[in-house]
Structures are given as structure tokens and as C-alpha cells.
Swiss-Prot record:
GO molecular function, one term: ATP binding
Residues engaged in binding Mg(2+) 2: E413
Quaternary organization: Homodimer.
HAMAP family xref list: Lys_tRNA_synth_class2
Protein name in the entry: Lysine--tRNA ligase
Listed Pfam families: tRNA-synt_2, tRNA_anti-codon
CDD domains in UniProt: LysRS_core, LysRS_N
Length: 507
């Protein structure tokens, strides 16, 4: 039975006592005149008054928030009350409050949401506070907060009950405020440069746009399966075919894959496509975006990330894929281009290989094993193997290389971009190769998308496109090591209900 332990029952009883006193424990009648931050700013000058009593009894203000700390001292009490803008100290005196003080002492508790009216004053310790003249409980919290004023430290509980995490840990609120600022700043950056924000389908008849395993659902009215999108890429490029020369979308993608510190099955990305540009210009635009973000957010160019310090100074390093394998990963030059030699080298180094792989996939295995973990400062890796780049344009100089880059920061891929493949015949052959790979057991290989090939047949202008992971970007900017720390409600393993409200506690 819900709400069954004795402490919750006691709080429920106090709510009933409020009703008996003619007070609604879920009152909706209030007039808040100032947030806590506004109050502290408005009356800051009181702290510099020379008079012994630093107060302004003519200034009546009303505030509201959650009680985070409450201490009774005979005929007086002090409380710390928190709203979204911050914490404000409240002084309560029985002389001024009368019946309200009795109600406070008997029925109000940490966790309750209250409204308080009074005047500003400065305590003997120099803290600007509110001297209460009236107070009432707006919301009676019947579930006690954990550890009272000391915070919530159980990581798993923080993710499962994010509302509790936000109540107890102010720094978590700051992370998600910054995340919101990142998204709005990214949107503004592209709008200022003439990009059009669009919305494309979240349910696809064919999964495509990335090598990943999709989630499958069923459309009852149409009687067909649909796939939650793994990427919006093919729809966005259809729009470029249609004449929109610069488009972007900020939205969710879904991939039915494993979860770890940098992967969540649903995640936020921005993808953007720019006609008559190349991947070289995308790298420059990406650097410009980072400079814009750091300026708007007021961030220093060097940020901590775990035990590392990341230098975001421009320009970012650029290094070709194979050069990175040798110079950063230590793979011998004579091994990189030879399929059997590279396979043997990887096996010798303990890299697990599954099934038949071409030279490009083997190089990708080597990159993941030996290079990625060493990419701390922002680094563009360029000239990817064509085999692992089914939607990217072939290099004019070397048909085995794609005009593609990925940006790595803090050991993680942050973005992926390339000059788009706009040859419909080449795209058709690459889709056929992907289908063959899927039939051979590669679950992440892409499906044939005939309509997309047909769209290319109408002419896609030279175009460059890129996707940037918002979640991983926020991880970097907020020094969080887990993607769960930057997603309000991350995916978690299913477990039996563990709410403390279901447990009977012994006195």
C-alpha cells in the first residue's frame, strides 16, 4: 500500500490537522512579489547601513519556496527556504505571527512548500533575511526528504527519482540550466547564419542515416511496422534536394544498443546540412560554433574533465585517419594497409573480432582500440575509410577514402560530418553492399532506401552535413563523466519498485 510507513502517516495526519484548522494543505491562494534572488538584490543596500538595526519595516514583500532547514528556538524559529533562484533565510517570531507561529511549530516540516510575507532585515551575523509577519503552508509534503539538509548521494536513486535529485542537489539544477542554454545557443547560432530549422519524422518506414540497430514499433492504422529514427539524415538531405540550402534539426534519436557512461538509447543531436559547401568548411563552422558557445556561456577556454584538462583554444587539431592510427595509436605503417597483417596485429593485441571484415572495418577496430582513448583536446580526424562511410562522398584523390571527419574531445566522438554522397548510382551500390552485410549478420548495417536513391536522382547539389551530440557536448562543458548526469530522465535497468514509501519502518 502506498504511503504506509509511520513517518509518512505522521505527515498525512498533520495535513488533516491543517484542514481541521480551516487551512488547505494544498493552498493555491498566494501572491509572491519577489523571487529569493530578486529579494536579495533589491535589499542588498541594507547590509551597508551604519545604523545598529539594519531593517526596512515599510518594505513588505512575499516570497515562496520549499523549507530546506527549520530550527525552533523557544518563541522564535529560523528557516532556510529555497526557490529556483536560491535560498533565503526567514526569521519567525511568535510575537508577530501568533497563530501562524503555532501552526509553524506544530505542523510545518522540512520539505513543505510555504509562502511567507514580511520585511527585510540583516541579522547580527550579517545575513540579509526576511522577518516574517505572515506565513502559510502551500503544499504539505508527505514524503520526507532524504538526509534532511545534507543532500542525496545514492547515484542510482538520483537517476530514478530525478525530482528528488533536483530538490537536494543544487548543482544538478545548474547542469540542466546550462544544458538548456547550450541548446538555445546552438539554435541561435544556426539561425543567425541563415539556416532553417525543420522537423522530420520520428517514425521511419525504413531505418537509415546511421549504422545502428533500431527500435521497432507498429502502426495499427496502417498495419505496418515503423522504426524510431536512428538519424534524420536522409530526410534532411531530401529537403536539400527540394531546394532548402541550409537546414538543421535539434531532436531525439533512438538506437537499440547497449548503455554505458557515454551511450543512452535515446539522445539529442543537432544535424545540419549546407548546400554548396564541403566538409572542410564544416570543420571551420564547427570551430566557430564552439567559439560562439564559449563566449555566450562565459566559459574559460580550458575546462576540467575528470582528471584531464581540455584546451578548447582555436583552431582545433586536424589529423588524417591513417596518420592517427600510426602516430597516436602506434600501429605500424606496414600493417595499416594490409588486411591480413592488420587482422593478425589486432588479434595479437587482444582485440576481439567478429565475422569477416574488410580493411576499412579493421582499421576502425584499430582506431577504437588504440586511438580514441588518447584524444583529449579537440581533434578532427579526417579521411575516413570509405567502407565505414556509406553516405559520404568519395575523395577525388583516393576513392578508398571518404571526405569525412569526426571531432573527438575528451576521448569521445562529439560530431560526425562529411561532404555528402550525391551520386545516385554510387549510393545505390553502397546500399547494396550494406544490404549484403546485413544479410551476412551485421545487425547495424543500413537498409536499402529506394526513395532516397530516387530523390538523389533528381539532383542533390554539392552538400556538407554534420551531426553533433548535445548530451556529450554538455558532459564536456559541465565536467560530468556519465551521460546519465546530463539527461533529466535517463534509461535505466528495470527493477522492482523500491520506493521507501512502500516500506513499513520500525520506530
Amino acid at each position: 500500500m502506498f504511503f504506509s510507513n509511520q513517518y509518512i502517516k505522521q505527515r498525512i495526519q498533520k495535513g488533516e490537522e491543517l484542514r481541521e484548522l480551516g487551512r488547505n494543505p494544498y493552498d493555491n491562494q498566494l501572491m509572491r512579489t519577489l523571487t529569493h534572488a530578486q529579494f536579495l538584490q533589491k535589499f542588498e543596500a541594507l547590509k551597508s547601513l551604519e545604523s545598529e538595526e539594519k531593517r526596512d519595516e515599510s518594505a513588505k514583500e512575499s516570497i515562496a519556496g520549499r523549507i530546506k532547514f527549520l530550527r525552533h528556538m523557544g518563541k522564535a524559529a529560523f528557516a532556510k527556504i529555497e526557490d529556483e533562484s536560491g535560498i533565503l533565510q526567514i526569521y519567525f517570531s511568535q510575537n508577530e505571527l501568533g497563530e501562524d507561529f503555532k501552526m509553524l511549530k506544530k505542523l510545518a516540516e522540512v520539505g513543505d512548500i510555504v509562502a511567507v510575507s514580511g520585511f527585510p532585515f540583516v541579522t547580527k551575523t550579517g545575513e540579509l533575511s526576511l522577518h516574517a509577519l505572515e506565513m502559510k503552508i502551500l503544499t504539505k509534503a508527505i514524503v520526507p526528504l532524504p538526509e534532511k539538509y545534507h543532500g542525496l548521494v545514492d547515484v542510482e536513486l538520483r537517476y530514478r527519482q530525478r525530482y528528488l535529485d533536483l530538490i537536494m542537489n543544487p548543482e544538478v539544477k545548474e547542469t540542466f540550466k546550462l544544458r538548456s542554454q547550450v541548446v538555445s545557443s546552438v539554435r541561435r547560432f544556426f539561425e543567425e547564419r541563415g539556416f532553417l530549422e525543420v522537423e522530420t519524422p520520428m517514425m521511419h518506414p525504413i531505418p537509415g542515416g546511421a549504422n545502428a540497430k533500431p527500435f521497432i514499433t507498429h502502426h495499427n492504422a496502417l498495419g505496418v511496422d515503423r522504426y524510431l529514427r536512428i538519424a534524420p539524415e536522409l530526410y534532411l538531405k531530401r529537403l536539400v534536394v527540394g531546394g532548402f540550402e541550409a537546414v538543421f534539426e535539434i531532436n531525439r534519436n533512438f538506437r537499440n544498443e547497449g548503455m554505458d557512461h557515454s551511450h543512452n538509447p535515446e539522445f539529442t543531436m543537432i544535424e545540419f546540412y549546407w548546400a554548396y559547401k564541403t566538409y572542410h568548411e564544416l570543420m571551420s563552422l564547427t570551430e566557430e560554433l564552439f567559439g560562439y558557445l564559449f563566449e555566450r556561456l562565459g566559459l574559460p577556454k580550458i575546462l576540467p574533465h575528470g582528471e584531464e584538462m581540455i584546451d578548447f583554444s582555436l583552431p582545433f587539431r586536424r589529423i588524417p585517419y591513417k596518420k592517427a592510427l600510426h602516430e597516436i595509436g602506434g600501429v605500424p605503417l606496414e600493417v595499416i594497409e594490409e588486411k591480413e597483417k592488420l587482422r593478425a596485429y589486432l588479434i595479437e593485441k587482444g582485440v576481439r573480432l567478429e565475422g569477416e571484415m574488410g580493411i576499412g572495418k579493421l582499421q576502425a577496430e584499430a582506431f577504437d582500440a588504440f586511438v580514441e582513448e588518447k584524444l583529449i583536446n579537440p581533434t578532427f580526424i579526417t579521411e575516413f575509410p570509405i567502407e565505414i562511410s556509406p553516405l559520404a562522398r568519395r575523395s577525388d584523390e583516393n576513392p578508398q577514402i571518404a571526405d569525412r571527419f569526426e571531432l573527438f574531445i575528451g576521448k569521445k566522438e562529439i560530431s560526425n560530418g562529411f561532404s555528402e554522397l550525391n551520386d545516385p548510382l554510387d549510393q545505390l551500390e553502397r546500399f547494396k553492399a550494406q544490404v549484403a552485410a546485413k544479410n551476412a549478420g551485421d545487425e547495424e548495417a543500413q537498409h536499402m532506401d529506394e526513395d532516397y536513391v530516387w530523390a538523389l536522382g533528381h539532383g542533390l547539389p554539392p552538400t556538407a552535413g554534420e551531426g553533433i551530440g548535445i548530451d556529450r557536448l554538455v558532459m564536456l562543458l559541465t565536467n560530468n563523466r556519465s551521460i546519465k548526469d546530463v539527461i533529466l530522465f535517463p534509461a535505466l535497468k528495470v527493477q522492482k519498485s523500491d520506493y521507501t514509501i512502500l516500506k513499513e519502518e520500525e520506530a
